[in-house]
């Protein structure tokens, strides 16, 4: 059976009654975390996003409370959520930030006047589809960006919210996939604002094509398995594990990860480890031993040793570790050190190595060892296998609320989301 049809069958068969309480709790945690990220981002992004509202009018309500067309509201919300690179993560053959899709789900829900239960159901559905595709195959190793899988997951979520039948859901998935194969260049070398915008566009596309499918527009019948479909063109007919789809059960959110620090997820454990080391003498060199994905994503070229933008810095393992070592802290103000002489000097002494044993431990563990060697040839090390926020060491609701408040989310919004299951005609505004 065509993969899109397998996904569509899961989407239409899955329902709210299949969601257990732990999954509901974690979905609420993800909504709080995502909306808090959006709140903090708004002050930086409003000058880019708000002027477009005049020409893209509609009845969907954005997280800022302004109205827009539902597709632009989806882009708007998702850009705000993704911009900080501080929302959740999933790590497998392909990484994903599944809560990116929450921006589109909330935008569509505001227009449809969906209930809180409808939203929880849609998020559980979208997460399951998106992360299952990440289990099936790696896009990044083939030069394609992970937002391709995000778009399929978001289309599944939008289809669920729109209550589409199996045939129309399959069309929405096809329309989300075939025209929207995004290049990994978004995340290569020196990074731009599109690091956040790529996810937002993918979610916008997903909501838009779900509406097209609802109206009866059809997509290619074999978007995954056709002669010119994803599996044959991108995966060369191999390297995509169809059996992953057999494991879909709606609990995938439990395997996603929340960030403690505002940096790319592969750096979370490294920052924690760096904070364990108190520099005492002149540093001769710093060695970071880690797994393949962390090295490939966070130390792939010279720009990561001398980042010029915030977008590159939060994907730079040498910079992130150096700042944490020198300041014994890591928060948004840490990015003010991009051009700091002491940080640049220490960064130049950093070496990043892939350790085969660590690569074999990934993705169930994210091992990193940092060793600081001093000029007198003494040294000290710190090791982490997983950071706080990993599903093996999860952040609880209280810790997530503390993070949300630090990002500027107030009690009114937090209380509203905490009680989302009982809401009718849901609208979330920060």
What is the role of each PLM region?
Residues 23, 27-31, 100, 118, ...:
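Residue-level detector of well-ordered alpha-helical segments, enriched
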């Amino acid at each position: 059976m065509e993969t899109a049809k397998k996904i569509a069958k899961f989407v239409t068969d899955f329902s709210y009654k299949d969601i257990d309480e732990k999954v509901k709790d974690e979905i609420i945690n993800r909504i709080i975390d995502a909306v808090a990220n959006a709140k903090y981002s708004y002050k930086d992004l409003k000058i880019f996003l708000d002027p477009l509202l005049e020409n893209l009018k509609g009845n969907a309500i954005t997280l800022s409370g302004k109205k827009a067309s539902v597709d632009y509201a989806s882009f708007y919300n998702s850009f705000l959520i993704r911009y900080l690179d501080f929302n959740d993560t999933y790590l497998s053959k392909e990484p994903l930030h599944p809560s990116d899709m929450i921006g589109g789900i909330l935008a569509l829900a505001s227009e449809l006047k969906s209930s809180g239960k409808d939203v929880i159901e849609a998020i559980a559905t979208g997460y399951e589809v998106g992360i299952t595709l990440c289990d099936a195959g790696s896009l990044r190793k083939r030069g394609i960006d992970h937002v391709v899988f995000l778009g399929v997951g978001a289309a599944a979520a939008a289809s669920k919210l729109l209550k589409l039948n199996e045939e129309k859901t399959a069309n929405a998935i096809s329309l989300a996939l075939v025209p929207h194969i995004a290049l990994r260049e978004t995340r290569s070398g020196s990074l731009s604002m599109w690091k956040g915008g790529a996810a937002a566009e993918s979610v916008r596309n997903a909501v838009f094509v779900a509406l097209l499918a609802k109206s009866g527009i059809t997509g290619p019948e074999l978007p995954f398995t056709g002669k010119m479909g994803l599996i044959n063109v991108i995966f060369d007919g191999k390297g995509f594990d169809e059996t992953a789809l057999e494991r879909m059960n709606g609990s995938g959110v439990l395997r996603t990860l929340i960030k403690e620090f505002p940096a790319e997820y592969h750096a979370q454990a490294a920052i924690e480890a760096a904070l364990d080391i108190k520099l005492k003498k002149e540093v001769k060199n710093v060695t970071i031993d880690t797994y393949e994905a962390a090295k490939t994503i966070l130390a792939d070229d010279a720009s990561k040793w001398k980042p010029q933008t915030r977008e590159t810095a939060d994907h730079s393992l040498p910079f992130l570790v150096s700042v944490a070592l020198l300041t014994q802290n890591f928060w948004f103000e840490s990015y003010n050190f991009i051009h700091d002489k002491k940080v640049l000097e220490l960064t130049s002494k950093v070496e990043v190595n892939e350790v085969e044993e660590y690569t074999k431990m990934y993705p169930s563990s994210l091992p990193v060892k940092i060793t600081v060697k001093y000029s007198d040839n003494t040294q000290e090390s710190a090791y982490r296998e997983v950071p706080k926020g990993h599903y093996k060491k999860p952040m609880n609701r209280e810790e997530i609320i503390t993070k949300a408040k630090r990002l500027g989310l107030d009690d009114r919004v937090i209380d509203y989301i905490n009680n989302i299951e009982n809401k009718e005609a849901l609208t979330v505004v920060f």
